[in-house]
Amino acid sequence: MQRSPDGRIPESSKLSWMLLATKKPGKGDTGSMSTADRLTKAGYIHQSSAGIYTLLPLAQRVVAKITRIVDEEMRAVGGQRLAMPSLLGPAGWQATGRWESTRGELFTLEDRRASLLLLAPTHEEEVTAIVKHMVRSYLQLPLRLFQVTRKFRDEARPRAGLLRAREFIMKDMYSFDVDETRAVQTFDEVERAYRRCFDRIGVPYAVAEADSGNIGGALSKEFHFVSSAGEDTLLVCRGCGYSANTERARAGRGTERGADVHRVVVRGAEDRMVSEFRVVVPAGHRPNPLKIKAVWPVAVHENLELTLVGQFGADEAAALSQAVTSASGSDSDLGYETESGAIKCLVDMLVDNQLADTVRAIGTVQLGDWHLAQAGDACSKCESGTLEAQQAIEVGHIFHLGDKYSKALDLTVLNQGQRSYVQMGCYGIGISRILQAAAECSNADGRGLRWPVAIAPYLATIVPLDGSDRVAELFAMLADMRVRGVRVSEDNVVVDDRDYLSAGFRLNDAQLLGIPVTVVLGRRFKLASEVEVQLRVPGLTLPPEVAGVAVRGDAYEHKAYVHVDKLVEFLTCAFGSHTQI
């Protein structure tokens, strides 16, 4: 953006020109208000219907900054940006089996010819078809293709604002490599790029081992913003840094434990019971359905669902231990025949050693890791630490897919005279989720939001209560300011010129909007050329004096009166050791 030749402030940098209708929080709202409500009251989002939101101009600015960071880091690892259609045919999804397995989450429709279509929740099938059409030789690999588009998912219970929306903005990248070794190298390289993205965004985050779910693949990691309000639970070891979600986490052996017995019912596509069997897990733990399903012959029974049917008491657990001790081969009364004849009884390897050793000698019992880890368990990585629960909000997920999609859709390349399936990966970042998650994690107080500097809609707002004849001068000063060598720019400064509102309303709005720097031109500006500077920056801690200026404040906000000639020096020092713009 360029300033007008006569030095005037562009209309686009004035709040009077913006679609903005804030609502002051009520007295009872300060502690209980959800982040989605805060964003609504601050004029960032507007709910259209359940799980569907309009991103208003301020939110769109935040999204644009998040997208710019992600775009730069994806291009830095060789990503090429494209835009695939949101409206897709079902053929690819039927070929991979996801048309049936995810049908409940798909928005489907028919055109005037009664042809089925779907609104894309993700694009593995489509991008595989594109590469199949255009790539013939391994010499055309690797490829890393990404997009930032709207996605659609029929959430059963849309809630929590943008965190569980039915329409959302997502960055998804897809990688194509000639073999597994190079595909895993790509996975590691993109993981590092993701870390750079979240480092730049400036919200504390965790990287956790994860289950691949319906996407598929054997290698998977999640990126989470750490927040006590998060719906996800991570299990972390403070000793060695191990981190995983509860479905994926593995517990170490620790102390010897007794056993609890659970009955698992396996149901088919038409809710018919295929079979049932017993799972023996450490006392006080629950079986892990994802780990159990991984060993079930899904190829024999499509769309299997595992249902945990209660927990047997201590008496039956003792009886089971006795039964295992005395059992031999197929005479064991623990086993339940399946249609494939594969599984009799699953016994967790972390039950007491005597029982585990006995189980190893019984051919009809399968020993493995069948339980859900929980806080207090020993860490399986370092074997000396203890797992702790940590609440978090998922904002990114990366997968090594292998040949799941390339094999289903017959994507091959010619390599040394042989045709081989391409190895794939997919990498998602929830752009609109980050918008709300960052607001959630930045410790808003009763006065309003607090945005990380890198993604705030504006770096600074000027509130002229007096001395308005010098507003253009201050605007130019802030726009030309450099922090860590980067010019702030006119597009990052806004003036609250809404003279029709009271001074108190505009000052409250400055806090409500969460813009990091507020410069107030009041009486002291007219009398002594001093402006009041308010800093609302997550994680910013300042000493009592910065650049010779006295600073006062609390955990949420810092204030100082600064002579206009020292304003740039003061802000440069305040931000210089904190973050980058």
Regions found by a protein language model. Give the residues of each.
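NTP/phosphate- and nucleic-acid-binding module
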Residues: 1-581
